[in-house]
Amino acid sequence: MKFALLSGVAAGLLPVVSAVSVSGAAEGFAKGVTGGGSAAAVYPTTTDELVSYLGDSSPRVIVLDRTFDFTGTEGTTTATGCAPWGTAAACQLAINQNDWCTNYQPDAPSVSVTYDNAGILGITVASDKTILGSGSSGVIKGKGLRIVSGASNIIIQNIAITDLNPKYVWGGDAITLNDADMVWIDHVTTARIGRQHLVLGNDADNRVTVSNSYFNGVSDYSATCDGYAYWGIYFAGSSDLITFKGNYIHHFSGRSPKVQENTLLHAVNNYWYDSTGHAFEIGAGGYVLAEGNVFQNIDTPVQSPIEGQLFTSPDTNTNTVCATYLGRNCEVNGFGSSGTFSQADTAFLVNFEGKNIASASPYADAQSSVPSSAGQGNL
């Protein structure tokens, strides 16, 4: 479907007052997640206190009512890195993490890099946690979140994660999952991130729902040297079920998302806006059902070649196949000034049978609502 460009689509988010309790419930694969449940809310006031609450063994509801700035809390490092994309002011440089420059960019010029240590590794989040922002006040600056090593039953809602060494590749990921289960990420904003805004690592991440979140790729530095972040969203787990619904993915030049290994992704009612490169990158083992989404000013909705499988819900007749596996027909996607998105692989749709499936609305609903409703402060 084609539609005209909406005026003001990139307008600022509309702040609203939110209560310090979970709003709504997870749809899709993470349906039933409870986080900290009925635990009494705690309000950390320092970065140390926040780290302690997130990582302890008690069920907790942790309310963020201020900015927790980790910048400088772990010192800085000056080392030799590299410049794979040149040394122009808008180009990201790379930290030589795990000898990445040495092994993968041997011809890149060497450069001196100085980065903030806090951004490199996120805060560990243990099981049975709810992390809630109060209004638009809950911000974690300079450090991400890390849900790993069997952690499960976690809700992250209405917070922002910002400013993780944006000048440097390997400068840090906003949210990392690896060997996790039952995680709901909702109404989260990420901005100015050195590496991935969201990454699901190589171990199984099982049941995850990412909803109503704003991935903001506007940056002074990027791998494409044009102000469009390249490192967006990376789904590469060994047995992952991901519902990705109602999200606003804005101003990226690639990897938004990259899907591979053994990942079943249901991308529904999202809004991709303004990309100089590609949105989806689908490697071997990536299985993507995309329906009811909006692609506006996206040069390449999916990068070629597609090594996994993709069902793009191309038309109402073809979309009736979804009824067998989802219990309803799929919704067509909408396009404005965007490239081709038309593949219709169906063999993998059987993997949706018997699972919790998110509902879908016509793409026009996402077109009108997602830019102003996604992200922090919009519960």
Curated annotation (Swiss-Prot):
GO terms for biological process: cell wall organization; pectin catabolic process. It is found in: Secreted. Keywords: Carbohydrate metabolism, Cell wall biogenesis/degradation, Disulfide bond, Lyase, Polysaccharide degradation, Secreted, Signal. The active site is at R255. One of its GO terms (cellular component) is extracellular region. The gene is pelA. Pectinolytic enzymes consist of four classes of enzymes: pectin lyase, polygalacturonase, pectin methylesterase and rhamnogalacturonase. Among pectinolytic enzymes, pectin lyase is the most important in depolymerization of pectin, since it cleaves internal glycosidic bonds of highly methylated pectins. Its EC number is 4.2.2.10. It catalyses: Eliminative cleavage of (1->4)-alpha-D-galacturonan methyl ester to give oligosaccharides with 4-deoxy-6-O-methyl-alpha-D-galact-4-enuronosyl groups at their non-reducing ends. InterPro entries: Pec_lyase, Pectin_lyas_fold, Pectin_lyase_fold/virulence, PEL. It is an enzyme of class 4 (lyase). One of its GO terms (molecular function) is pectate lyase activity. Residues 1-19 form the signal peptide. PANTHER family: PECTATE LYASE 18-RELATED, PECTIN LYASE A-RELATED. Disulfide bonds join C82-C101, C91-C225, C322-C330. This is Probable pectin lyase A. It comes from Aspergillus oryzae (strain ATCC 42149 / RIB 40) (Yellow koji mold).
